[in-house]
């Protein structure tokens, strides 16, 4: 290769890109795009691991005799899941209660556990806590056959359960009817007045307008 041509190629390789040039902007965009892609990939892997850990717990605590779960049984299983750290928290509290300890040990671990349980409890008592749909017999069978491969998670149908799901519909309806009945009785009882002995009794219906109603006397203190 001629020396002149070789020198030109070396110079071209060492050419510095201007920081405000279009080439520099393109390189910056590609770098940000790659960083975002890696971040999303990491976040997705983390979410899959968390979901996998949760599903492994439910898988290991399934009742092998059941072909499907009722809402009540599924809610009881969720309650057990929300109580899964109770033994560890007791051990941490016991260690912290021992005399001559300087500060609280395992504080970061304790804080993470409590934050996790608080978030899960809010979900369960709010818009719902997601678990495998073990109320469906086919999904339960698929879940039993799961080999803990995270790539197979899309094959497991999920559903949300709330704390209210533990109460049968008939009992809910009965409670609603009782409340409506009590409200109806209150409406039928009409307005009330005050008597000298402090007990309330129906007010007089002799007047029809507010102007004609007798003011309720204020009892002396």
Swiss-Prot record:
Which parts of the sequence are annotated with region: Disordered?
180-221
Which InterPro entries does the record cross-reference, listed alphabetically? Tma16, Tma16_sf
Q: What does this protein do?
A: Involved in the biogenesis of the 60S ribosomal subunit in the nucleus.
Which family is this sequence assigned to? Belongs to the TMA16 family.
Look up and give the organism this protein is from: Mus musculus (Mouse)
What this protein is called in its record is Translation machinery-associated protein 16
Q: Which UniProt keywords apply?
A: Nucleus, Ribosome biogenesis
Localization, UniProt: Nucleus
Fill in the subunit field for this protein. Answer: Associates with pre-60S ribosomal particles.
Q: Name one GO molecular function term.
A: preribosome binding
Q: What PANTHER family does the record tag this protein with? A: TRANSLATION MACHINERY-ASSOCIATED PROTEIN 16 (PTHR13349:SF2)
Q: Gene3D superfamilies recorded for this chain?
A: Translation machinery-associated protein 16-like
Q: Which GO terms describe its cellular component?
A: nucleolus; nucleoplasm
Which Pfam families does UniProt cross-reference here?
A: Tma16 (PF11176)
GO biological process terms on file: ribosomal large subunit biogenesis
């Amino acid at each position: 290769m001629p020396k002149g041509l070789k020198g030109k190629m070396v110079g071209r390789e060492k050419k510095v890109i201007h920081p405000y040039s279009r080439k520099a902007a393109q390189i910056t965009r590609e770098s940000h795009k790659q960083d975002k892609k890696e971040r999303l990939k990491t976040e997705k892997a983390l979410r899959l691991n968390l979901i996998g850990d949760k599903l492994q717990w439910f898988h290991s605590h399934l009742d092998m005799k059941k072909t499907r779960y009722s809402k009540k049984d599924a809610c009881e299983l969720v309650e057990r899941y929300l109580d899964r750290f109770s033994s560890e928290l007791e051990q941490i509290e016991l260690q912290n209660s021992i005399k001559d300890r300087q500060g609280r040990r395992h504080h970061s671990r304790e804080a993470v556990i409590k934050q996790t349980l608080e978030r899960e409890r809010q979900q369960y008592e709010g818009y719902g806590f997601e678990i495998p749909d073990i109320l469906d017999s086919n999904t339960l069978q698929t879940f039993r056959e799961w080999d803990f491969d995270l790539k197979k998670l899309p094959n497991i149908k999920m559903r949300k359960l709330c704390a209210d799901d533990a109460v049968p519909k008939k009992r809910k309806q009965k409670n609603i009817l009782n409340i409506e009945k009590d409200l109806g009785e209150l409406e039928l009882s009409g307005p009330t007045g005050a008597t000298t002995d402090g007990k309330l009794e129906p007010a007089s219906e002799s007047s029809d307008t507010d102007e004609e109603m007798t003011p309720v006397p204020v009892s002396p203190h």
